[in-house]
Amino acid sequence: MKIRVTADSTCDLSPELRASYGITLAPLTVMLGEDAFHDGVNVTPQDIIHAVENGKTCKTAAVNVYEYEELFRRVKEDCDAVIHLCIGKKFSACYDNACQAAKQCGNVYVVDSGNLSVGLGMMALDEVEMARAGKTPQEIVQALEAERDLIDTSFVLDQVDYLRNGGRCSGVAAVGAKLLHIKPCIEVEKGVMVVGKKYRGSFARCLEHYVKDKLEDRSQVDFSRVMLAYSPCEPGVAEQMLNYLGTVAEFKETLVCTAGSTICCHCGPNTLGIIFKRKTPKA
């Protein structure tokens, strides 16, 4: 049985990884002022930052039912079944829209990743590997639903202005973070974003403490794969963190991805995170 994997563009996988794994994306909409663009198609993170610096508002919108249906029908032309992995349903209407579209297409399975960015991307890679190993759609869906509680997704923000503009952080909290030079760690837990540890100091130093903290309990870390994701950063920061990560822990595979336009719209520049799997769900 030939199974094709599709995912929301918020998976933030590199073009090379998508090509290697045969993953087709459903692009979310990015609004810069009154102009609409498609994530990963005709807008870049640099475009987002430039627009915001010039006073434009930046918003995102879910893939609509028609767009999903068109994607599913096109992909199904050369396969027996499609499994679509969505950004967490508590973050976006994408999941509900994809489910509606799937009902019109047949043999399309929609999975709520409960995640975002490369947390979603990591699940998509595992999804393809299961399909290539001969798993049935039902087996893959069941495995993904169990896996989402094992994905450890987090990132550190250099600034919270973009979160505030997107309504995910109060103005008071944003002002306080700026005045105190706080770099918050944002974590995904049970399908929602929560604030973890708060760091102070230079962005690079905060990132080192963050990486060390995340990998402190080694007994719970699955060392098969780690993914480092970042939005446009100061020169050398991502490379520095990649090297530092190698001194803290030894993963079998390390993948580096850049945050796409949708994620950048909410986190802004100078955001970096590491994503890996845990052996057991967080308590």
Predicted feature residues:
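Mixed-charge interfacial surface used for oligomerization/domain docking
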Residues: 4, 10-24, 29-31, 35, ...
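Short active-site oxyanion
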Residues: 1-5, 80
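Class I S-adenosyl-L-methionine
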Residues: 36-104
